[in-house]
From Swiss-Prot:
Lacks deubiquitinase activity. InterPro entries: FAM105 (IPR023235), OTULINL (IPR023236). The lineage of its organism: Eukaryota, Metazoa, Chordata, Craniata, Vertebrata. Its main location: cytoplasm. The keyword NAD does not apply. Does not bind ubiquitin or ubiquitin-like proteins. Belongs to the peptidase C65 family. Otulin subfamily. The keyword Acyltransferase does not apply. GO terms for biological process: protein linear deubiquitination. Residues 1-80 are annotated as: Required for membrane binding. Residues 125-353 form the OTU domain. The N-terminal region that precedes the OTU domain mediates interaction with cellular membranes. One of its GO terms (cellular component) is nuclear envelope. This is Inactive ubiquitin thioesterase OTULINL.
Length: 353
């Protein structure tokens, strides 16, 4: 009887326990599922964040690399295609002076006073800086001849200057001209006549073109183009050197027949280093463009050969009679005038009035 009574209780207890287990099971399973899903999601998020971080780091490195390469190529192309003008654009004279001559040394004070003299007394407002090398005097003169559209000297109108190299050799027996040196190239040999002919031919062609051009702005644009080509420039300057040599040779032959010649040539041939055209070429002319520029007597010969009055403001001679000089000293009145300025008789720039 006792066992019979306890059976329902056991069944009731069993049903209660079973229900609790079912409830616990229903709670535990979703919890485990959610936990598993969370772990998977967290792992996925961490993986995604790691990939994103790596991707951002890669693109940042790529961006920096490409930026560096782009900057390098931009600089290269700018250097490659930028016009390397050997005669720069106009700069305000006093601003140029202030930039170049700072401090209170006696030299700096002298230069500032000289530039102020140019500005106030001679009305020079700007300066065109010229590339500093051993051709700068020739460059400064030729640039102004072309930019002003000056015509040929009278003697060049009467002769075909392209044939002058052969004329010196065959008509005047100057076989020593084979020792002519083309500035830093130091070229000598049997082909020197061909090289000189090409140089003189280029000078004649360019001079003819500029002198026939009436548009000032067009001449300026063409000058900027021409004076940014170093190879063409050198050929033009060698042509000018040869014309100087030709004039020296012509005057030397005239002196043999006791003809009256300009005093500057007597001074030239009185020097121990240039008693004749060959010595002048070997000891002076061949070095121009290579180890030295034009000295004062060379400037005289250049002005005489091109039939221009070269007025030079020698700033280091401020407050003296040699502050402004002409090459040659007694030019003919009808010769056109061009102006240069120098701080030391070695480097020349172009004043703009």
């Amino acid at each position: 009887m006792k066992a019979t009574r306890s059976a329902p209780r056991e069944r009731e207890r069993s049903r209660t326990t079973s229900g609790s287990d079912q409830v616990h099971s229903w709670i535990l399973v979703p919890s485990q599922v959610l936990h598993a899903v969370w772990r998977i999601a967290r792992a996925s998020v961490m993986t995604a964040l790691s990939l994103l971080s790596a991707t951002l780091s890669y693109f940042r490195s790529l961006y920096l690399y490409l930026g560096h390469q782009l900057k390098w190529w931009i600089g290269y192309l700018q250097r490659k295609f930028k016009r390397n003008l050997s005669v720069e654009a106009e700069v305000d004279l006093l601003s140029y002076c202030a930039r170049e001559w700072k401090g209170e040394t006696p030299r700096a004070r002298l230069m500032r006073k000289a530039y102020e003299e140019l500005f106030w007394r001679y009305h020079v407002k700007c300066v065109r800086p010229v590339k500093r090398d051993n051709y700068d005097a020739l460059r400064s003169v030729l640039f102004q001849i072309f930019s002003q559209g000056l015509s040929f000297p009278s003697w060049m109108k009467e002769k075909d200057i392209v044939k002058l190299p052969e004329k010196l050799l065959f008509s005047q027996g100057c076989n020593w001209i084979q020792q002519y040196s083309f500035g830093p190239e130091k070229y000598t040999g049997s082909n020197v006549f061909g090289k000189l002919r090409k140089c003189v031919e280029l000078l004649k062609l360019q001079w003819t073109e500029f002198s026939g051009m009436r548009d000032y702005h067009k001449r300026g644009s063409m000058c900027n183009s021409l004076f940014s080509d170093a190879i063409l420039e050198c050929k033009l300057y060698e042509a000018l050197k040869f014309l100087m040599l030709y004039q020296v040779t012509e005057v030397y032959e005239q002196m043999k027949t006791n003809k009256i010649v300009p005093s500057l040539f007597r001074l030239l041939f009185s020097r121990e280093s240039s008693p004749d055209p060959l010595s002048f070429m070997m000891n002076h002319l061949n070095s121009i463009g290579d180890t030295c520029g034009l000295d004062q007597i060379d400037m005289f010969i250049l002005g005489y050969s091109l039939q221009v009055k070269i007025k030079v403001f020698r700033l280091f001679k401020f407050n003296s009679r040699d502050f402004a000089v002409y090459y040659p000293e007694e030019p003919l009145r009808e010769w056109p005038e061009i102006s240069l300025l120098t701080e030391n008789d070695h480097q020349y720039h172009i004043p703009v009035f």
